[in-house]
């Protein structure tokens, strides 16, 4: 597994990655897989499309695609949160087709390795929805500790190198 740059060759694949469950929608037209469309709303993370646009206009954020065996399987966004005054793993997602296989844990460890190369970065924060039980378990397993604080209605976690 590795982190790769988002490029003009792969950006469309990145925005089509989703954590949303596969849903077939019927209407006046033929049924289609809603998961085959880029999503703007995810359960516990902002969409990849939103995140990529955010990183264009706020260049403190670094965006990477997560690749495993030549397949794009996820997305990460990290950098310095100027408003809060700390380094943050702002977004991490693994596509629904690849969840439950340990890829999220591996991907977070890769991001932490990347962030460790930043001289000033001695700790990394992330925040998550209080109902994201699976995510919280993964974060704690890696070594993030709950701060018992909220950030924008999300629980704050900290990882210290």
Language-model features, listed with the residues they occupy:
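Acetyl-CoA-dependent GNAT
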Residues: 1-90, 95-97, 114, 148-152
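Conserved SAM-binding loop
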Residues: 3, 100, 128
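Conserved GNAT acetyl-CoA-binding A-motif
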Residues: 115-127
